[in-house]
A protein has these predicted regions:
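Active-site beta-strand->loop->alpha-helix modules in alpha/beta enzyme cores, enriched
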Residues: 1-70
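The feature marks non-catalytic terminal segments
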Residues: 2-7, 24-25, 71-150
């Protein structure tokens, strides 16, 4: 649905359960993939505070930022979830954030639909959509994304 070849989809055996991802574990997992893809362009959720950021997602951002500062990640961008943007700017006024309007709206909608896919027989449980349905619905109507550099 997202246009990614099946051979490029990786399910991490060492993944954490919801609410249990630490920066250290995230770092370990990111490093594993950087060994395989050393020039990867890394995109993840911002490591900086805002009221609605899921702690597991923030751990990924913290680990990626640390690896960037060590020179292990060369190209890094952080996303600020649209529902957190106002609070993010209030708490992080000096972080320059720019809007990204998807030039390929169809890809964005396909990616969102992957999170909505319900097919338990094939391991698709629509977990992302079920946990934050209102956020997906909002993104479907307001397709603006917010991004910042390290």
């Amino acid at each position: 649905a997202m246009g990614v070849k099946e051979s490029n989809i990786h399910i991490e055996d060492n993944r954490a359960h919801d609410g249990e991802l630490s920066k250290e574990k995230a770092r370990e997992i990111i490093l594993k993939y950087l060994e395989e893809y050393p020039d990867a362009k890394v995109k993840t959720v911002t490591p900086f505070k805002a009221s609605g950021i899921h702690e597991d997602h923030r751990a990924l951002g913290e680990a990626a930022l640390e690896l960037y500062r060590e020179g292990k990640i060369k190209d890094l961008r952080f996303y600020v979830e649209p529902y957190d943007y106002k609070d993010f700017k209030k708490v992080n006024p000096n972080v320059e954030v720019w809007k990204v309007l998807p030039s390929q709206e169809e890809k964005l909608l396909s990616a969102m639909n992957a999170y909505k896919k319900w097919n338990p027989e094939s391991g698709h449980y629509a977990i992302g959509y079920h946990s934050v349905k209102s956020h997906f619905d909002e993104l479907a109507t307001n397709k603006t994304q917010y991004v910042h550099a390290p």
